[in-house]
Amino acid sequence: MTNIRKTHPLMKIVNNAFIDLPAPSNISSWWNFGSLLGICLILQILTGLFLAMHYTSDTMTAFSSVTHICRDVNYGWIIRYMHANGASMFFICLFLHVGRGLYYGSYTFLETWNIGVILLFTVMATAFVGYVLPWGQMSFWGATVITNLLSAIPYIGTNLVEWIWGGFSVDKATLTRFFAFHFILPFIIAALAMVHLLFLHETGSNNPTGIPSNADKIPFHPYYTIKDILGILLLILSLMLLVLFAPDLLGDPDNYTPANPLNTPPHIKPEWYFLFAYAILRSIPNKLGGVLALVSSILILILMPLLHTSKQRSMMFRPFSQCLFWILVADLLTLTWIGGQPVEYPFITIGQIASIMYFLIILVLMPITSTIENNLLKW
C-alpha cells in the first residue's frame, strides 16, 4: 500500500513542499528565514485576531481599548506586546532574507524574486496601517505625514489624499478603513507567500555557491525540518526576551499620549524598520523628489536581475563584490540611524551622503565591480 501522504490530494501538496522536497545539501542558516517569516506571519495573524476581539476602531475609544487590552483582558498585555514586537522580528527576518537573496544571487529566479518584492511592499503597507490603530500621538501624526506624501503626485495628489483620508484630515473614517486594511492584508500576504513558494519549487532552492545542485539533493525532512525548528526556537526566544524584558524598547514614548490634532510632536518618525527609507525621503529638499526616492529605494530591488553583470551567480567567490555588499549594509544602518535623528546639521549632510551612496552602490559600483571580477577570471 502506498503511503497516504503521497496519494491524498491535500497531503500530497504538503508532502511535496515540506517532506519529500529535494533540497540542496549545502544550504546554510541564511536559508532559515523563509520558514521564520512563515512563523512570524502565523504568529501575527493569531495575536492580531485576539487583539481585534477587544479593539474598537473609533477615534473616541481606540486608545482606551488598547489600554483596556493591556490592563483588563486576560494576558492582553502579552498578546499586545507580542504583536507589536512580532512586527519588529518580522522585519528583521525580512531584511535578512532579502540580504541573503542579494548576496547569493537568488534574484535570478525572476518570478520568485518579483513576488518577494511585492510581498515586501505589502508587509510594509500592513505595518504602516497597523501603527495607526493604537491612536497615539505618533500613530496620528505618522499617518498624517506619510499619507500626505501622496499629495506630491501632480494633478490628482490632493484629491487622492482626501479620498484615502475619507475627509479633510486624518479622522474617524481613516482609522476605520485602516483597521479594515490591517485585517485583510495579512491574508493577502499569506496567499502571496504561497505563490512565492510555488514559483520557488518550480526551480528548487539556490545554494551558497550559486552552482546548480541537481546532482546532490537531500530530502527536506528530517534534515531541514530539524534545522528550521532550531531557527524557530531561537526566533521565539529572542521575541520573548524582547516582550518580557523590554517591550517598549523599539516603540515610541509619544504613542502613550492619546492622539491630539492640535499638538504636533517635536520629532515625527516612523517605526525603526522604516527609518532607512524615511532618511532617504528627508534627504531630498523637494517633496516629489523625496517621494520618488522613497519608492525607488525599495523598487530598486526589481532591477537587481538586470544589474547582475557577473559570470558567477553568488558572491561567495567574489571578494570585491562582498566588500561592496557589506558597505551597502553599513550604509543602510547609517540611514536607519539618521532617520531617527532631528533634521539639523550634521545629520542632514550625513543623510544625503548615505542616500547618494545607497543608489550609487546598487546602480553603478556593483555592476562595474562584477565586470572587473569577470576580467580577473581570465588571468
Swiss-Prot record:
Pfam families hit by this protein: Cytochrom_B_C, Cytochrome_B
InterPro entries per UniProt: Cyt_b/b6_C, Cyt_b/b6_C_sf, Cyt_b/b6_N, Cytb/b6-like_sf, Cytochrome_b, Cytochrome_b_C_euk/bac, Cytochrome_b_N_euk/bac, Di-haem_cyt_TM
Cofactor binding description: Binds 2 heme b groups non-covalently.
Transmembrane feature ranges: 33-53, 77-98, 113-133, 178-198, 226-246, 288-308, 320-340, 347-367
Positions annotated to bind a ubiquinone: 201
UniProt: heme b b566 binding residues: 97, 196
GO biological process: mitochondrial electron transport, ubiquinol to cytochrome c
Localization in the cell: Mitochondrion inner membrane
Cofactor: heme b
MF terms (GO), sorted A to Z: metal ion binding; ubiquinol-cytochrome-c reductase activity
Swiss-Prot/TrEMBL keywords: Electron transport, Heme, Iron, Membrane, Metal-binding, Mitochondrion, Mitochondrion inner membrane, Respiratory chain, Transmembrane, Transmembrane helix, Transport, Ubiquinone
Positions contributing to heme b b562 binding: 83, 182
First and last residue of the signal peptide: none
Job description of the protein: Component of the ubiquinol-cytochrome c reductase complex (complex III or cytochrome b-c1 complex) that is part of the mitochondrial respiratory chain. The b-c1 complex mediates electron transfer from ubiquinol to cytochrome c. Contributes to the generation of a proton gradient across the mitochondrial membrane that is then used for ATP synthesis.
Annotated family: Belongs to the cytochrome b family.
Remaining remarks: Heme 1 (or BL or b562) is low-potential and absorbs at about 562 nm, and heme 2 (or BH or b566) is high-potential and absorbs at about 566 nm.
Protein name, UniProt field: Cytochrome b
Source organism per UniProt: Capreolus pygargus (Eastern roe deer)
